[in-house]
Amino acid sequence: MSFDLEAIRSQFPGLALTDNGTRRIYFDNPAGTQVPVCVAAAMADCLMTKNANLGGYFASSLDADRVVQSARDGMADFLNAPASDEIIFGQNMTTITLHLSRSIGRLLRPGDEIVLSQMDHDANVWPWVLLARDLELEIRWLPFDKESFEFDLDVLDELITERTRLICVGSASNLTGTLNDIKAICARARAAGAMSFIDGVQSAPHIPVDVQDIGCDFFVCSSYKFFGPHQGILWGRSEVFEQLEPYKVRPSPAELPWCFETGTQSHEGLAGIAATVDYFALIGQSMAQAQLGNWDQFQGQRQQVHAAMELIFDYEMTLTSRLIEGLLDIDGITVQGITDKDAMGRRVPTVSFTHETAAPDKIAQALARQNIFVWSGHNYAVEVARTLGIDETGGAVRIGLVHYNSIAEIDELLTGLPAALAG
């Protein structure tokens, strides 16, 4: 059995909703995806039957312990983490990054340098800028080419010095959609004796993630971007965690992972995370038999999840090609990202565009009236919008595809877009 779109879509109740008889088309996915039935059911079950705090001797507390461990085990499989106790949960990626930045800051001294990217979401920019202000650190900016929408890693080599302590970059841009060569970037960080912090929020819904192969020290993502609940996830290398002093209250355990998790977590959210990983594993088991052999270094759920993500990305590249081809056929549109049909593997299916006369927010409003959901603006990619020169003209219209979207939905967008551009 190959990719079965009908079976996929049947798992998501939100896709069947209509407004005044018009079905909803969800292209707002980079800001948050719909969830399958299994995720909502797991969260409800946790609240109704496993609602207790951790560490007790009684049944509901033991059930809660198992929920949390299941989520850690699931995310370890999803990310190919060496150990589940390297998985840290939090409210969201932004909160986790702000929290961790304070612990990392204890290792830094005035004059130390952090390399940041002009392609990143502000959640992987401003926490580090604030840290630099507090500690008198130097920020060195890695630009991207405005024609190729990619980094020149020779420029990164020039930015790295003996004072470089940390390199922070996103795996994929939430505005241009570019997939960055984070493995090469992390190799450069290691060679310089610097830590690497990877924002994987925009790549995790689309491609297999293997933190061991990437070679990073930290990797963050958000499960609500990959069909789960509103939760943030951090993976960190245990030997690097051991160098950090966590910000925590006195009764909290001193050991990983608990020392970096403040207060009681959302157990229902963690139940949803475990169910999200189960969802991917089921796709791998039922639809990705052809891909399983590409991941025979793994076993069980870990193998199934990675095979599923490979299958998903292959399908999404078809969607992306169709969308970009259609956008380029419309007069006045500029796609702010890679458009070469032979380079779809170097981007995720997040496609942003501008128009020579129509404002992004007006386009988004007009599409919303057609029940087509997109975002407009800078979408928190502040440095990206500035670099592209679109920050003062309303940013861009962002169309975000995922594996439950269809060619038919893309064609409906392309059919309705000229009217939206005309106002």
Predicted regions span which residues?
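Pyridoxal 5′-phosphate
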Residues: 1-423
